[in-house]
Amino acid sequence: MASPNGFFNHLTYFLAAGAVTLGIGFFALASALWFLICKRREIFQDSKFKAVDEKCRQRPSKAKIKSHPQCVFISRNFHTGRFQSQEEQRKKETACIKANNGYSKDDFCLATKKVICDPSESSSATNPSSVTLSLSTLPSDFYYSQSVEIADDWYSDDSQMKKSPSMPFLGEPLMEKVFSYLTTIPLEQCTENVLNMTLRDDQKDDNLKEIFTQRNTEVEIQNLQHNTE
């Protein structure tokens, strides 16, 4: 017959071994789950990046869209609410390029003179941005540089500077007026005013002190009457 102590010892050994194996199994399962979660995140992120790359590739490049900005008819598309097809845009772009190439330098000079000399367009001549907008029918690289030169000449003209002199600084005449007014006031009058102000303040302080003393005496009299009663 085996002793009960040996049986209990064997039972404890088996229980300890089972607990250790269960702990190892749970640790392995947890590590496997963590590995799967991390892989899933990586796969999900990769799929997102791939989808974004595909969308970016499907979109047309901005350089191709903005190659000829002067030929895009924004007002027509805005009012009608329909976008033109690519073939129609290409045809219009080629027509605009041919028309722009047909302009000569003399036409450009006449257009600039008309813009500057026309009295109805005087407001646009003073503003360089409006000058560039009024000449939008000419080639972009050529008329932009010419309009900038015209604007520089316009603003650097001495006659225009004489016609529109700069406004004087308002702070200096105001300060001069203040100083001149202060110099006209005599010092005796200033000292008299200061003395009068100090006397008035002293009188006010004396009146307040008298009022407080009267109130204190009245309160003391009332307290004495209550105490006697």
From Swiss-Prot:
Organism this protein belongs to: Bos taurus
Signal peptide annotation: none
Matching InterPro entries: DUF4718 (IPR031695)
Keywords from the UniProt entry: Membrane, Transmembrane, Transmembrane helix
PANTHER family named among the record's database cross-references: CHROMOSOME 1 OPEN READING FRAME 185, HYPOTHETICAL PROTEIN LOC689589
Protein name: Uncharacterized protein C1orf185 homolog
Keyword Cell cycle: no
Annotated compartments: Membrane
Primary subcellular site in the record, as a coarse category: membrane
Keyword Transmembrane helix: yes
A Pfam family hit: DUF4718
GO CC term (a single one): membrane
